[in-house]
């Protein structure tokens, strides 16, 4: 099964002022991401407010991204849901429209507390798109599924034919690497922590990843990998440190989903506000965030159109 090389973006979902999905900016969005070195998108996930979307909206978004994706640009559809039946339907739809792959995080309710529960969840969803690679999206901070991922790999190995790997969005670089080493790298371990790309590269990982701050800082995150491959460790270190400074700023403004989405407006692509229950930024907060970003010369270095 093909492994992803390079960084995939987790895009935000554009909304109109009235809260309806705005499909119009997606073409320009896709072109901008490709221009800045991103290799594809992982849509309708946490950054995309997937759990705040209806099933119809999720399918329409998948169709729109497929329509506008540049040649060779991978579209991976997050199909996770609290309803496995809905997830399987979304998986079937993703395969039907020609998506490159699918993924699913564990549901926030009911909380998954055992490996077998998680395996069964993944198994049923993956069966909805048997011809597509399936990635489990490990983000336990969102759903409380603090389960050992090495045990998940052992459990799915030979049981789920299209299980491709894990989008690993957790703080344990040790566990990430142990998963990467399982059976000499059998599974595709996509790095999901933009703040630790460089240390993961140092262990031999992070050849592929899915990021959230890639939306506006992808050019620098891609640069970390490029500098590492070129043997320019100092450049890679400087880019990683800068990227952490950007993350420090968004952490002051409710993180990437809220603060990061507002950054898109500041760099020229207004994607609207977040859906309830997210607390949107005020104009005053936006001004403060902009000043903090200017202080680190972000706008001279960010993604460009």
Where on the chain are the PLM-derived regions?
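Single-residue recognition of alpha-helix capping/boundary positions
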Residues: 25, 57, 151-152, 232, ...
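Short glycine-rich loop/turn motifs that provide flexible caps or phosphate-binding loops at active sites
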Residues: 5, 39, 44-47, 79, ...
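Structured C-terminal cap/extension of enzyme domains
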Residues: 35, 199-305
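A general structural signal for well-ordered alpha-helical segments in protein cores
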Residues: 26, 58, 62, 87, ...
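Catalytic alpha/beta core domains of metabolic enzymes, predominantly
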Residues: 126-132, 140-244, 250-251
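Alpha-helical structural signal in soluble globular domains
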Residues: 36, 60, 64-68, 93-97, ...
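Active-site beta->alpha loop and helix N-cap motifs at the rims of alpha/beta catalytic domains
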Residues: 2-145, 303
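Short secondary-structure capping/turn micro-motifs that flank functional sites
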Residues: 49-50, 110-111, 172, 198, ...
């Amino acid at each position: 099964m093909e492994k992803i090389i390079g960084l995939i973006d987790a895009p935000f979902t554009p909304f109109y002022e009235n809260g309806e999905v705005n499909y119009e900016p997606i073409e320009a969005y896709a072109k901008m991401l490709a221009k800045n070195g991103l290799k594809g998108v992982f849509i309708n996930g946490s950054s995309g407010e997937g759990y705040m979307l209806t099933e119809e909206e999720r399918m329409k978004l998948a169709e729109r991204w497929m329509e506008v994706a540049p040649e060779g640009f991978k579209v991976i559809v997050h199909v996770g849901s609290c309803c496995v039946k809905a997830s399987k339907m979304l998986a079937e739809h993703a395969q039907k429209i020609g998506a490159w792959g699918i993924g699913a995080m564990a549901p926030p309710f009911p909380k998954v507390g055992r490996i077998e529960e998680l395996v069964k969840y993944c198994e049923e969803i993956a069966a909805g798109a048997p011809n597509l690679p399936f990635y489990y999206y490990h983000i336990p901070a969102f759903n409380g599924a603090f389960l050992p991922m090495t045990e998940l790999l052992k459990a799915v190995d030979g049981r789920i034919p299209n299980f491709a790997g894990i989008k690993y969005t957790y703080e344990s670089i040790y566990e990430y690497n142990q998963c990467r080493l399982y059976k000499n790298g059998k599974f595709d371990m996509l790095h999901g922590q933009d703040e630790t790309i460089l240390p993961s590269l140092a262990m031999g990982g992070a050849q592929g990843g899915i990021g959230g701050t890639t939306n506006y800082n992808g050019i620098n995150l891609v640069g970390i990998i490029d500098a590492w491959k070129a043997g320019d460790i100092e450049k890679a270190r400087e880019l990683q440190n800068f990227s952490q400074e950007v993350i420090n700023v968004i952490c002051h403004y409710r993180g990437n989903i809220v603060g990061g989405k507002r950054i898109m407006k500041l760099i020229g692509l207004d994607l609207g506000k977040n859906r309830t229950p997210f607390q949107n930024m005020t104009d005053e907060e936006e001004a403060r965030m902009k000043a903090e970003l200017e202080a680190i010369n972000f706008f001279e270095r960010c993604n460009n159109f």
